[in-house]
Amino acid sequence: MPIKRLAIYTLLAAIIAATSALIVRQAVIDNVPQWVMKLIQDRMADGGDRWNTCSHTRTYGPVHGGVSRANPDSMVSVMAYDLSRGPVRVSGETWPNYWSLSLYQDNTDNYFVINDRELETSSFDFIISYDDEVDPAEQAQHITSPTETGVMVIRRFVRSSDELPAVLANQDKMYCGPVTTGS
């Protein structure tokens, strides 16, 4: 085989390999975040029975023999939401030491964050919707999600285990669920 033909075949093979690598790379970048978020949402929603409801961390401090939390001094409330079922309300009282609410769309992008220092009062009332489907008479702060599904995370900083009963009561007073009259 002449060297010229071998060089052309080698160049074509390199172009095909590079193009294939770019296509695979882009497919991974475009799809892996959604796959990861779907796994997280399914785990949080317990296979579909707990969409649009909150789950709460009920223990304080490091977890011995279990999966470590990012911050053992944080008591966390989480919710996997599905707005195809309608808007979702999240309301309650903040926590005096530190409180924050973060919302993530279905590709893991964080699209909304607020903490207790940004609120005018110690209570919060948010309605999360898709496509601005909220009754204008609602007095809650309206947040439009860029995707129909996502995840909400509320973090509370707890200084010691002595605060555990109070933070558990704070979590239990929260409302996470569909927007209904009087919710």
What are these regions (language model features)?
Residues 1-183:
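A compositional/structural signature for long, glycine/proline-rich flexible linkers
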